[in-house]
Design a protein with these regions (language model features):
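Surface-exposed short loop/turn segments
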Residues: 18, 67, 76-131, 135, ...
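Surface-exposed patches in mature extracellular/periplasmic domains of secreted proteins
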Residues: 53, 66-79, 159-162
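Generic solvent-exposed, charged/amphipathic alpha-helical segments
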Residues: 57-65, 150-153
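Second-shell loop/turn segments in exported
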Residues: 42-52, 68-69, 134-139
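C-terminal/domain-edge helix-coil "capping" segments
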Residues: 17-32, 108, 121-162
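Positively charged n-region of N-terminal signal peptides that target proteins for export
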Residues: 1-4
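A structural "domain/chain start" motif
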Residues: 10-62, 161-162
Length: 162
């Protein structure tokens, strides 16, 4: 009976698992994105690791410039914020096969990055969100951040499809 309960619980979590690499994006269809030329940063939920925060800001600045937006210290046409979250997913199949007394549960860290653009009235104009498994090798973090940020900005309303 316990096995059946664990199996059902596994299906529940599997069915709700996000697809890494997929981008979910929304935008205000009434907004004139071609008229937006400048942006300023506002606070979101910064990355826990300060180096990652700096990399995310740089990657978003690069991609924003790629869609024709110029960063201003204050007073931009819009504000941009980013939000991050990291969760550790436990590999339940591997967990059942291992010696539970001497080994830690196998996990994979799943990072989530959300970029939100708002107008002067704080109305959301565009948002994009993606998830990506994070390599435990911190040296690979800059490339992962850049790849995910590029992926997010492919959904920006004025960006021509490639």
């Amino acid at each position: 009976m316990k096995s059946v309960a664990m199996l059902l619980l596994g299906f529940l979590f599997t069915a709700q698992q996000p697809v890494p690499g997929k981008v979910d994006s929304t935008f205000d269809k009434q907004a004139n994105f071609a008229a937006i030329k400048t942006y300023s940063w506002t606070t979101g939920t910064d990355a826990f690791v300060p180096e990652a925060h700096t990399m995310i800001i740089a990657a978003i600045d690069k991609e924003a410039a790629g869609v024709g937006l110029k960063r201003l210290a204050t007073g931009g046409d819009v504000t941009i914020a980013y939000y991050t979250m990291t969760v550790s997913n436990v590999d339940l199949k591997a967990l059942d096969k291992m010696d539970k007394k001497t080994m830690a549960a196998p996990t994979k860290d799943l990072g989530k990055l959300v970029v939100v653009m708002r107008d002067a009235a704080h109305q959301q104009l565009w948002s994009a969100m993606s998830r990506e498994y994070l390599d435990p090798d911190r040296a690979k973090l800059p490339a992962t951040i850049q790849t995910v940020t590029e992926r997010l900005f492919t959904t920006y309303p004025t960006r021509a499809p490639k």
